[in-house]
Amino acid sequence: MIGKEVTVQDFTLELSELQPEVLPVDLLCEEELPNEQETEEESDIDRTVFKIIAPCGCSSCEVNLRIFVNATDTGIRTLQDLLISDLQLLCPECRGNCKHGGF
């Protein structure tokens, strides 16, 4: 660079000197577009509305919580496993008594 201001002439770009793994790649060259039948199959995933009644996770509360979800069979089973093992729902009153990150 000569002078106080940068000009386009100050930059020289030598793409031929780049390593093969750094060279630009046409991102569409290896892409396969799904046909219409595959697209329809993806949109036809069966979802069902479920009503879930679960007790509040706080030991001193006796409130039953009711939530509604729209899920696949796999999704509702995963949620059921979480509710049985690691996940506990809290009512708004018990949530107000909790601190962020724990009780």
UniProtKB/Swiss-Prot annotation:
One of its GO terms (molecular function) is protein domain specific binding. A motif (Nuclear export signal) lies at residues 76-84. Its main location: host cell. A motif (LXCXE motif) lies at residues 27-31. Residues 1-47 are annotated as: E7 terminal domain. Keywords: Activator, DNA-binding, Early protein, G1/S host cell cycle checkpoint dysregulation by virus, Host cytoplasm, Host nucleus, Host-virus interaction, Inhibition of host innate immune response by virus, Inhibition of host interferon signaling pathway by virus, Interferon antiviral system evasion, Metal-binding, Modulation of host cell cycle by virus, Oncogene, Transcription, Transcription regulation, Viral immunoevasion, Zinc, Zinc-finger. Pfam families: E7. The keyword Transport does not apply. InterPro entries: Papilloma_E7. The E7 terminal domain is an intrinsically disordered domain, whose flexibility and conformational transitions confer target adaptability to the oncoprotein. It allows adaptation to a variety of protein targets and exposes the PEST degradation sequence that regulates its turnover in the cell. Plays a role in viral genome replication by driving entry of quiescent cells into the cell cycle. Stimulation of progression from G1 to S phase allows the virus to efficiently use the cellular DNA replicating machinery to achieve viral genome replication. E7 protein has both transforming and trans-activating activities. Induces the disassembly of the E2F1 transcription factor from RB1, with subsequent transcriptional activation of E2F1-regulated S-phase genes. Interferes with host histone deacetylation mediated by HDAC1 and HDAC2, leading to transcription activation. This is Protein E7. It comes from Human papillomavirus 12. The gene is E7.
